[in-house]
Amino acid sequence: MVGTQAEKELLELVKPIVAAMGFQLVELGLHRSPNGSRVHVVIYRAEGVGVDDCAALSRNLRPRLELAAGLGEVGLEVSSPGLERVIKDPAEYEIFKGRGVRLWLRDAADWLDGVNEGVEDGALGLSRGGQRLRFGLEQIVKAKLDAS
């Protein structure tokens, strides 16, 4: 989710605020330019995330971000993960546990659909047609949420 020291510091600031408002932090991005900084926050809640939720979090985060040292002028974007989000980090399997997913496995000829059962011992559990399948994370080339 984060790589640079600035992103780690930003994560420490943002994550507790997101959690206190009842959301899970899915993604946090920081993009700097000579004109200021742009922060992108993706949040999730099983009951869904609406425009009002994003606006409320934005109102709560913006003043804190503006006070954060070194960010300069801050642009803030808060959004939901979307219906068919590409899963970018193994931690997202836990966030989206119980949701439908589509997997593209190494040497596969087509997408494999099922219900995400989370990661255990480095393998993703997938319910499909009454069966529970397991795939090592290294086998998964691409994964995304399935809105169908």
Language-model segments: residues:
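Short Lys/Arg-rich amphipathic alpha-helical segments
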Residues: 1-113, 117-148
